[in-house]
Amino acid sequence: MTLTIKEVKQLINAVNTIEELENHECFLDERKGVQNAIARRRKALEKEQALKEKYVEMTYFENEILKEHPNAIICGIDEVGRGPLAGPVVACATILNSNHNYLGLDDSKKVPVTKRLELNEALKNEVTAFAYGIATAEEIDEFNIYKATQIAMQRAIDGLSVQPTHLLIDAMTLDNALPQVSLIKGDARSVSIAAASIMAKVFRDDYMTQLSKDYPEYGFEKNAGYGTKQHLLAIDDIGIMKEHRKSFEPIKSLL
């Protein structure tokens, strides 16, 4: 008895590797609906394989540390919010669980919102430890954004419930005695830093969304404090509020 196309699709969607797909008894079924289902499944499996390969690549720096220090407790650190005109800079320090496997981890700006939220939820529930650090707009104005970012990162480290032995940091160095590796574009090269990037991004976006409830005119829930047209027009119309960075242009020139 010939299987219906719907039944064949169910079988195809249960296949977990391209090799298995190519050897499947339905592979030679010439019906258009079956061939379309095979093509879709192949594409999905190829995407999943690419994510797995990227994930392995992004464990390189962690594995290099573990080769020399098998018991190392590695902490990834990243920040978000260096460029906006309003709101804090937020850092996250994350110690991944030993059996971590968060396919899709990447620079948070490259990860679709739905996937970012999914990863954030999994990370919060499963990692060994994480903590956030914040430097306020006032501190950014007082110290400059680079120093404020360092402050936020150190606060995140200090907030961890587990003491790390090694730090992987996105494009920064810290005045910290722990061994540290600074990686340019680290959020796309290290799973630990990418995890911190995702968590920091979601935390700050939530913060700015809450802030928008008190200051709806600026559109913080959409622009996260960046200088969009709506944001700049609101500054022209009603001025600035306490979370605006007075050392950043064009705000600085308006004072």
From Swiss-Prot:
Gene3D superfamilies: Ribonuclease H-like superfamily/Ribonuclease H. It comes from Staphylococcus aureus (strain MSSA476). One of its GO terms (cellular component) is ribonuclease H2 complex. It is found in: Cytoplasm. It comes from the Bacteria. Keywords: Cytoplasm, Endonuclease, Hydrolase, Manganese, Metal-binding, Nuclease. Transmembrane segments: none annotated. It holds the Pfam family RNase_HII. Its cofactor is Mn(2+); Mg(2+). Belongs to the RNase HII family. The keyword Cytoplasm applies. This is Ribonuclease HII.
